[in-house]
């Protein structure tokens, strides 16, 4: 003999739509496995979901009333009648039915809801909570002293609101880049491991994903590249954004100052006094001869215009290559050299 869906929900066969919803709400809350620890609660919870799935749909209910469970699922009655090509199969996930009915995958979120959300909880109607005290599906929570749910004299229920999902804080990673990568532009591949929701909306899986990070020419240190909602996902959160923050790698020859590049040129005292030509390397691998005919004092700066990094908003324009001179003095002088310098160098 097939299942009696009306009996499972505890309603007469002539029950209307509101009575069916009311019965499902009461029975589902009573037998939800998170609240009911009886051995058969899970199976009972599944039967309740299947009964509601059939009786809440006019087409399925009509076929069930005419042919029973067997006829509904096989497409025809035992007496040879036909219900057409429709064959019903329960999807098998009572938690999905519960989540769809109550508007959330966590069955008891409604009891810890706050006033943060202005949207009423669509699956809960206080007027429908007319269960007896001994059959109260929420009675087990009374011993924890939750506000409004403790056992004792009953009072008028207050409107409840769903707990709004809140996005997790951003997950920030430092991304080190060379000045050459900033000069030319580049694309980096970063592998992240994160948790994602399965199709049932409740369980999670771990998966890897490759993020392609496009670094545009001239981007400054501190620039943020954001991948929205690529963080861990759970039934109760909005995934965090993954954020990469650019950080300049130390360079063997150069230092960065915005779009300008600084280079320290070390010359001897003789070169500083007598003049020289200094070969200055550039970011793109060239060498520029820089004639120095005047006396070079320690800290002297010369500027090679347009040899720096691209401007972020106008990559065709570039900053400057700034050469800072350092003079290497000898550790000691011979008496003869000292005498010559005294004779030829000015006193001031």
Swiss-Prot record:
Tell me the leader sequence span: none
Keyword Chaperone annotated = yes
A Pfam match: DnaJ
Any one Gene Ontology MF annotation carried by this entry is: protein-folding chaperone binding
Boundaries of every J domain copy: 4-68
Keywords from UniProt, A to Z, are: Chaperone
This protein's GO CC annotations? cytosol
Record GO biological process? chaperone cofactor-dependent protein refolding
Report the PANTHER family cross-referenced here.
DNAJ HOMOLOG SUBFAMILY B MEMBER 5 (PTHR24078:SF553), DNAJ HOMOLOG SUBFAMILY C MEMBER (PTHR24078)
From the Swiss-Prot or TrEMBL record, give the protein name. Answer: DnaJ homolog subfamily B member 5
> What species is given as this protein's source?
Bos taurus (Bovine)
